[in-house]
Regions:
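Catalytic cores of soluble, metal-dependent hydrolases
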Residues: 2-60, 64-82, 105, 115, ...
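A short glycine/serine-rich beta->alpha loop
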Residues: 55-59, 91-96
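Long, hydrophobic, well-ordered secondary-structure blocks that form the structural core
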Residues: 82-94, 106
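Short, solvent-exposed loop/turn segments at secondary-structure boundaries
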Residues: 94-99, 187-189
């Protein structure tokens, strides 16, 4: 399947100038989509994804829309590993009751609902946050599929070993929230981690050299509705980091894949 790289712009946070090879979708008219995803919004998002599937590099606005990653993985019809590089686990219980999809529970819903998921790899969260997943109830929920690589382990150089333990015959889908990065490299509307861009790119390089990659999505923009000075500063930082990630992935992702 041909790779199609897309921008899903809900908050008008992406520059209108076109980056080569990127298809821009104005999603500002999709109601019921911020933080929580209504059934109607989900169907409209699916309609944007369906023509070319999930293969490629996709920018999905702020972390308020990270649930799009769940919708993306619903299109995968083969065994796969989900790699989440994020400051948070996104494994909350539904706060509004029922089973409504949200930016805070989408990973949990992938675990519960996707029969093709083989492994879930959480990368970049603080150890104290991951420790909360170790209760008996959480262990039962994950059904032995969970692999955790804390930020502390990343700093100690242990990530490469853990990543290489994944089944090499199973392709991966990578989801990145830029809130995992230090504010030098990204400014988001969520609390952030301390990862450097160099560390993130090294993780991506390890994943792509070891495994076939189905697709990649990236969120972590800063909504324009916030204060103008802060927004303009965030815009400069985020555009720079998005451009760097896009060019890094364009240059390396499919190049490495073609040599396997």
């Amino acid at each position: 399947m041909k790779n199609r790289n897309m921008i899903f712009d809900f908050t008008q946070c992406y520059p209108k100038r076109k980056e080569p090879g990127l298809e821009w979708h104005d999603c500002s008219a999709i109601g019921g989509s911020r933080l929580y995803c209504s059934r109607d919004a989900e169907e409209k998002i699916k309609a944007l994804i369906a023509p070319a599937g999930v293969s490629g590099i996709h920018f999905i606005d702020s972390g308020d829309y990270h649930y799009i990653s769940k919708i993306m993985t619903d299109f995968i019809k083969e065994p796969f590993t989900l790699v989440l590089i994020d400051h948070h686990t996104d494994m909350q219980d539904a706060s509004l009751g029922g089973d409504i999809l949200s930016c805070g529970n989408w990973v949990k819903k992938v675990l519960q609902e996707n029969p093709y998921l083989q492994k879930l790899v959480l990368i970049g969260q603080e150890k104290k946050m991951l420790d909360k997943l170790q209760s008996g109830a959480r262990q039962q929920e994950t059904d032995g599929k969970l692999v955790e690589i804390s930020y502390e382990e990343l700093k100690n150089g242990k990530a490469h070993e853990k990543i290489k333990e994944l089944p090499d015959e199973v392709p991966v889908y990578i989801s990145i929230d830029k809130d995992v990065l230090d504010e030098k490299y990204a400014v988001t509307n969520w609390d952030q981690g301390k990862m450097s861009m160099g560390m993130l790119e090294q993780i991506l390089k390890t994943l792509v050299t070891e495994y076939d990659v189905i697709g990649v999505d990236i969120c972590g923009m800063y909504p324009e509705e916030n204060s103008l000075p802060e927004y303009l500063r965030a815009e400069r930082v985020n555009i720079r980091s998005d451009e760097e990630l896009y060019r890094f992935l364009q240059k390396n992702l499919f190049c490495w894949a073609s040599h396997k």
